[in-house]
């Protein structure tokens, strides 16, 4: 049922994205392309389909998840990191910690789905690697000279300059996405 809901109501094939907020009849109520949610959903749906184990869902969902990954790669990934979102046609070019984490996993997943040795698979592998390099250099908090880094900054600009006015941890900021990314990378690589 959830896969059908994603495919039939949440995924927008015309815009190659998910819609994120709805009225009670499943009509989208805002024009928002959330790049992080699209790349996160792509790999989570693929994992869910794998667990369900029904070929019909794999056949239905794989084109959708590959379309989501392809679209964010083309419109939001600049070769080293993922922009946050596009709200009514205006792109927020800041880099939010969780979007960067989900980008690594999402592109690794897309590479596997396409075949890691294919041209498209190689494109996604290079993108995941570039994203990880951006994270290591700019998103991980290296203040106080701690070489391995600490928690991740909440937000950096597209050039990697951190916004230090945001807390490192708060109710909406914890190591969930970055911790899960590390576990997924260990499992996939």
Enumerate the predicted regions with their spans:
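Glycan-recognition and catalytic cores of secretory/periplasmic carbohydrate-active enzymes
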Residues: 1-189
């Amino acid at each position: 049922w959830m896969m059908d809901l994603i495919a039939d109501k949440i995924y927008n094939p015309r815009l190659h994205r998910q819609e994120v907020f709805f009225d009670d009849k499943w009509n989208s109520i805002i024009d928002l392309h959330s790049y992080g949610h699209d790349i996160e959903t792509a790999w989570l749906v693929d994992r869910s389909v794998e667990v369900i184990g029904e070929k019909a869902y794999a056949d239905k969902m794989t084109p959708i998840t590959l379309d989501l990954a392809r679209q964010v790669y083309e419109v939001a990934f600049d070769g080293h990191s993922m922009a946050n979102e596009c709200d009514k046609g205006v792109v927020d070019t800041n880099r939010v910690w969780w979007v960067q984490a989900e980008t690594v996993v999402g592109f690794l997943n897309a590479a596997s789905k396409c075949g890691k040795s294919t041209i498209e698979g190689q494109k996604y592998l290079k993108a995941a690697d570039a994203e990880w390099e951006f994270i290591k250099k700019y998103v991980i908090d290296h203040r106080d000279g701690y070489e391995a880094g600490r928690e991740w900054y909440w937000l950096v600009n597209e050039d990697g300059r951190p916004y230090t006015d945001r807390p490192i941890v708060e109710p909406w900021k914890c190591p969930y996405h970055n911790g899960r990314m590390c576990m997924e990378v260990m499992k996939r690589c």
